[in-house]
Amino acid sequence: ISRSGVLKQSDKLDHIGVFGKTVEDVALLTKSLIKKDLYDSSTIHYSSDEMLKVCKKGPLYEPKFIFYKTKNWKNVDKESQKSFEFFIKTFKKNIEVFDTPSYFDDIPKYHKIIHETDMANNFQGYYKKSKKKLSKEMVGAIERGLKYSAKDYVEAMDFMKRSYESFKEVFEDYHGVLSPSTTGVAPKGLKSTGSPEFCTTWTYMGLPSISLPLLTGANNLPLGVQLIGDKLDDLRFLGVANWLEKNCKKYAK
């Protein structure tokens, strides 16, 4: 999906997301938005005509998933942990729980280098002219971004390629990867959208992900399960997401 016209923060990390009531709604909307755009070099010619049809059809056979609790599992609130454990138990025929690969430990560091360096480059005009109008968090990120060396940035970019090359073989044996979307239900108010710590790895590797509100957490609010797929495999990815959504509804009845 083209990012043309959107305020650029990081060319390597920025991506467009969509919202929908169901996975099929997401497929319909995405089908209309995926286009090659000469103004965004990250876009490609991608055949999306069959996206909704493939999404409705779902996987050819019952899917298999890896579930990563990750080292951030301790940050998930207790009630949400119980919901995820119930989800894993319910789909025990389909889900295998694994520890994350050791190289995942370095991804947040490298993601931060790219994110903050690009932010410093793209937002320098706002920083110079209107620093006092920016949030403390943004000012801090820009100032850190100005301090990284070219070596730091190149190393972070190189690790991005190597980490994906190491990880992509997972999708040869599994239909997708599952993890929490965040540490719990949506926080009250508009000051924060919650912690991004469960999304950083997938954003860094450029993998598509979708948050499915399949569970219930604190105060009976919806709790997101995150499904991650392989690059450029959006048709199958949305079909698998649709299967997961519909089968969760069956268990809920």
Model-found features: residue ranges?
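Short glycine/threonine-rich loop-to-helix capping motif typified by GTGT followed
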Residues: 78-80, 108-117, 188-193
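Flexible, acidic loop-helix segments that line cofactor/substrate-binding pockets
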Residues: 41-48, 63-64, 68-71, 98-112, ...
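Short helix-loop-beta junction
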Residues: 81-95
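General small-molecule cofactor/ligand-binding pocket signal
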Residues: 94-101, 210
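Serine-dependent amide/ester hydrolase catalytic core
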Residues: 59-60, 73, 120-204
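Active-site pocket-shaping loop/turn-to-helix segments
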Residues: 74-84, 109, 156
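Structural helix-boundary/capping segments
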Residues: 1-71, 85, 148-158, 165, ...
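Short Gly/Pro-enriched turn/cap motifs at secondary-structure boundaries
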Residues: 7-9, 55-57, 113-114, 172, ...
